Amino acid sequence: MKKKIHKVTFLIDKKNNWIKSYLSKNNLLFKNRYSYKFSNNIDTIVDQDILFIVNYTKVLSDSFLQGNRLNLVIHASDLPKDRGFAPVANQVLRGKNEIYISLIEANKKVDTGCIFLKQKFYLKGTDLYDEIRSKTAIAMIKIINSFLKQYPSKINRKFQKGKSNFNKKRTDKDNKLNINRSIKKQFHILRLSSNKNFPAYFYNQGEKYILKIYKDKKK
């Protein structure tokens, strides 16, 4: 008897699609059991066995979610802690190096769905923006593959328990440095700044200065 090939789609925000290149480079496993596709257009997604919602910030309607058998959100925090936007960045700002990845069921209320899996990865405290992003992506791929290995026979849901908090969307102001504070006290802000897209900056005597950060590769 021919095995069923489960249809899997990754819904990725068009304006926040950096994860796609990692998913492409790091082969998704179990291709004999799953067919994979990527989309940033919900109109092209229907009747999927599994929909992974990755870095997608728009609200999805109940009717859309009901059109798929299982809708999963990958969220980089120890839910119910750090619901909302930029969970990794907000944890880095608090000095955390142990970061969880939660795989949850999508529902109407943001980041409140039942938990299927939790895994964690570690930062060094010296990682810069690109390194943090890379480690996050690798951890996301790992939890995806772990779930696909278990599906459909060995999956369990657990309700979220404990205190929760909700992080607001980060803005340009979050990259602003205070020239009256030390670099050490603001190092996490520098770590989270993207030299290309949103570098750190400060004002002095009415002028705005851009500050970019690199590791010395010569040492």
PLM features: residue spans?
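One-carbon transfer enzymes
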Residues: M1-K219
